[in-house]
């Protein structure tokens, strides 16, 4: 499945319990179509105690969400935006904001 965001992009969550929050993409899972976003979809994981390592605890961490629930955030527009592809004069393909034409 093709994912429209990349690692280190700033995105806005458009649906779900974290709607309206922004965060940076930490990891992209193209096979499942999910993304891991910093500070979004926090879940509690019950850590079992090991003999040699750590004690048991409840750890809060991010869980992956579907890529269709996020949109790229444009710093110039200060809003979530759709993206378009544009080919520059030197032949490189870049992503641009559909509203203000700023490159990402």
From Swiss-Prot:
SMART domains: KOW. One of its GO terms (cellular component) is ribonucleoprotein complex. GO terms for molecular function: rRNA binding; structural constituent of ribosome. SUPFAM superfamilies: Translation proteins SH3-like domain. Keywords: Ribonucleoprotein, Ribosomal protein, RNA-binding, rRNA-binding. Pfam families: KOW (PF00467), ribosomal_L24 (PF17136). GO terms for biological process: translation. Gene3D superfamilies: 2.30.30.30. The keyword Ribonucleoprotein applies. Belongs to the universal ribosomal protein uL24 family. Part of the 50S ribosomal subunit. PANTHER family: MITOCHONDRIAL RIBOSOMAL PROTEIN L24. One of two assembly initiator proteins, it binds directly to the 5'-end of the 23S rRNA, where it nucleates assembly of the 50S subunit. This is Large ribosomal subunit protein uL24. It comes from Clostridium botulinum (strain Eklund 17B / Type B).
């Amino acid at each position: 499945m093709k994912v429209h965001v990349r690692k280190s992009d700033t995105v806005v969550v458009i649906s779900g319990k974290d709607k309206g929050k922004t965060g940076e993409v930490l990891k992209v899972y193209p096979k499942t179509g999910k993304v891991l976003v910093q500070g979004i979809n926090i879940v509690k994981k019950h850590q079992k105690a090991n003999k040699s390592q750590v004690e048991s605890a409840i750890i809060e961490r991010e869980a992956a969400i579907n890529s269709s629930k996020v949109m790229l955030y444009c710093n110039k527009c200060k809003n979530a935006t759709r993206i378009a592809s544009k080919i520059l004069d030197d032949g490189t393909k870049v992503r641009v904001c559909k509203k203000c034409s700023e490159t990402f």
